[in-house]
């Protein structure tokens, strides 16, 4: 997981504290991509995290996102063994930038759209 600040204002919303299984890194274009658990409801999140803890790298495509490397900070690696006993905490924070002002978007709104 890490802190993230989106670069573009064209996004309808983004997660400021993603928990992502990184599956691709593109250093030439300066981005990485993977499955962000926070785009899943907590029960689905827990199930997917447990499969990651067992070595799987699959996830629903609705949680696949691309991130700019330079916009990620405070990166923390979660050992796979810790994902086996994963308990979803409400650590996601979805926001939208409107005229330079950051507005929080409820998680339930995000989950209902995906």
Feature roles, as predicted:
Residues 39-114:
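Intrinsically disordered, low-complexity, charged/polar segments
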């Amino acid at each position: 997981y890490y802190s993230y600040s989106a670069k573009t204002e064209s996004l309808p919303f983004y997660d400021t504290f993603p928990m992502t299984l990184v599956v691709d890194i593109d250093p030439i274009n300066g981005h990485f991509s993977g499955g962000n658990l926070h785009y899943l409801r907590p029960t689905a999140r827990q199930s997917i995290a447990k499969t990651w803890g067992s070595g799987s790298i699959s996830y629903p495509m609705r949680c696949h996102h691309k991130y700019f490397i330079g916009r990620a900070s405070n990166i923390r690696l979660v050992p796979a063994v810790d994902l086996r006993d994963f308990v979803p905490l409400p650590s996601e924070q979805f926001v939208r930038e409107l005229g330079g002002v950051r507005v929080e978007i409820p998680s339930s709104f995000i989950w209902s759209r995906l």
